Amino acid sequence: MSSATTMGQLPQHQTAIVAQGPGQMTIQKDAPVPALAHDMVLVKTATVAINPVDVKSLDYSPAPGAIIGFDFAGTIVALGSDAVKEGRLAVGDRVAGVVYGMDRLQPDVGAFAQYVGALADLVLKLPDHISLEDAAALGLATATAAYGLFKEMELPGALDRLSSSVPDRGDFVLVAGGSTATGTRAIELLKTAGFRPVATSSPSNFELVKKFGAEAVFDYHDPGCADAIKAYTNNELDYALDCIAEAETTQLCYAAIGRAGGRYVAVEPFRESIAQSRINTVKASWFNVMTVWGRKVELGGEYAREASLEDREFGARSFAAVQALLDRGYVTTHPIKLMSGGWEGVVEGVAKIRSQPPSGYKLVCQVA
């Protein structure tokens, strides 16, 4: 294997946060630095973002000994042979990306570590105006929003046609949970692709959601929310992306979809009893974005997935499309709340998200 920087120049061991058991983790000082595969880059981590999935995975499907974490940003220190040949990335590049954290099939790869081994085509090269702190929130939200909209929902139009000048198609798309990191990324992608995004959030986040491109935002606390959406969309809403996937949001989406029916896609399993209410007119599904790494997903129950080359290829295409937008200055970063404290701060952040999920911001920790 050829690489721009040999593994011999790098440490054999690192500090990382690894799973111990359900809800339990530890800061390990001698975790292995991941081996550099031909299609990977090795990144010296500067910042990490903490996601609800980090908590859920640790609490309900832990892989003892595996490194935790999905979202990271930092500087490339080594490239695998395929990444070298591609020529897009180089040692010293500032990047943000996403890895499958706490994977029992690849336990030495996770974001909460000094060095992250990431697939080269699932990292974004950062322009100078985006800081490593802000960039830490890009990876998982990008992967999830793109997959939900353009793969699972199969919205008309191709990823490689994303631009800032696509004529409006006139198709409304509802984003429930518009102030989440996935929600704001979905809204921006929809707007860029020529759709008309509308969203739900709490009133305190209305301006945030509009900043990302939602043409109308509705208060999900309002009992008349679904009726207001139906009125705004002329009872013709065909598509709904549910970034929350709780019973209340599923019910709201179903009530907002137009008289002719349409498509409901959720980021988590949803209440089937609600879906039965319009089974003949609304096609409903949910997805597990972890398939974009092209490996078997060994999680419990309905979260398990077989390896999918198709999803692996889609993940690469979606990041290439977003990279093009990023290069042209058409990507806005989600608000963050910055924590200090290094790896101890990350552990504290996981506990904080477990007790109080963030609203309108992503929790980011500086680790270097």
Curated annotation (Swiss-Prot):
Give residues annotated as binding substrate: 140-147, 289-293
Transmembrane segment boundaries:
none
- Tell me which Gene3D superfamilies the record gives: Medium-chain alcohol dehydrogenases, catalytic domain (3.90.180.10), NAD(P)-binding Rossmann-like Domain (3.40.50.720)
SMART domains recorded for this chain? PKS_ER
Q: Which terms in the Gene Ontology molecular function aspect does this entry carry?
A: nucleotide binding; oxidoreductase activity, acting on NAD(P)H
Q: Which UniProt keywords apply?
A: NADP, Nucleotide-binding, Oxidoreductase
**UniProt key word NADP:** yes
Matching entries from Pfam families are given as: ADH_N, ADH_zinc_N
- The residues that hold NADP(+) are 53-56, 179-182, 202-205, 220, 267-268, 358-359
The pathway is: Secondary metabolite biosynthesis
Superkingdom, natural source: Eukaryota
What is catalyzed by this enzyme? malate + 6 malonyl-CoA + acetyl-CoA + 2 AH2 + 2 S-adenosyl-L-methionine + 5 NADPH + 9 H(+) = trihazone A + 2 A + 2 S-adenosyl-L-homocysteine + 6 CO2 + 5 NADP(+) + 7 CoA + 6 H2O
Keyword NADP in annotation: yes
> Which EC number(s) are documented for this chain?
1.-.-.-
Quaternary state and interactors: Monomer.
The entry's family comment says:
Belongs to the zinc-containing alcohol dehydrogenase family.
* UniProt function note: Trans-enoyl reductase; part of the gene cluster that produces the tetronate natural products trihazones. The PKS-NRPS synthetase thnA with the help of the trans-enoyl reductase thnE are responsible for the synthesis of the carboxylmethyl containing trihazone A. The PKS portion of thnA synthesizes beta-keto-triene chain from one acetyl-CoA and 6 equivalents of malonyl-CoA, in collaboration with thnE, which selectively reduces the enoyl intermediate during the first and fourth iteration of the PKS.
**Protein name as annotated:** Trans-enoyl reductase thnE
State the organism named in the record.
Answer: Trichoderma harzianum
The opening ranks of the lineage are: Eukaryota, Fungi, Dikarya, Ascomycota, Pezizomycotina
